[in-house]
Amino acid sequence: MEMRKSCGFFFLLLLLVFASQVVVQTEGRVCESQSHGFHGLCNRDHNCALVCRNEGFSGGRCKRSRRCFCTRIC
């Protein structure tokens, strides 16, 4: 019986340790704006993101008729 109580206590302690390690990550809204510096058809997100970073945004991606849209956290 004593062994069973010890196992139960150990399980609860282990559960408490793992539960305290869970971190909920929240993200803000992402705002998009069409790039003013990107010219031509947007085929690669990487190129779009580089141009957007030079414009002061955090990144960018190709979408909507192959146009480059810059992104940032609002």
Curated annotation (Swiss-Prot):
Predominant localisation class: secreted
Disulfide bonding pattern of the chain: 31-74, 42-62, 48-68, 52-70
InterPro entries on file: Defensin_plant, Scorpion_toxin-like, Scorpion_toxin-like_sf
Keywords: Antimicrobial, Disulfide bond, Fungicide, Plant defense, Secreted, Signal
SMART domains recorded: Knot1 (SM00505)
Location relative to the cell: Secreted
Pfam families registered for this protein in UniProt: Gamma-thionin
Gene Ontology CC annotations of this record: extracellular region
Signal peptide: 1-28
Gene Ontology terms describing biological process: defense response; defense response to fungus; killing of cells of another organism
Record-stated family: Belongs to the DEFL family. Protease inhibitor I18 (RTI/MTI-2) subfamily.
Name this protein carries in UniProt: Defensin-like protein
Organism: Glycine max (Soybean)
